[in-house]
């Protein structure tokens, strides 16, 4: 369900207020473990909103708490990036890439930063897919998934539009190799062939 900004604003305000109540309560009762559960529940509620929206209004307090508790992992950054990329949301990716500027001395992981820049570039310049697709894919050691696969898969149709139509007998062969390298499944490959 797509949320209207006004609705989002209300949701953030409610979550922030709930979190403040829990924080106030926890100073009074230090032994209260249900309190921690409530706080985590509020933060995971916030995380869902963060993952599914390019930008959240007035979320500074929740974001900072969520971030300081290790909520913003590379895996979640890629999950959000994939959602934004699928919507061709360059602005959303820019916001995501600059998020850590809110925290003093916080630095984005270099590889993550490079990938976020790559996604923005592929949305702005789909012709650059060729350079990316001909590289060997990086496999994430933790998840065993190809890190930038979604960007390659989703950029293909846009890339094709950048190729001049007067090319001599275009053939799908070079793209077969890309599909192999990036381990496309049958559905993804079929989508590519349809786009071609």
Predicted regions and their residues:
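Alpha-helical solenoid repeat scaffolds
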Residues: 1-196
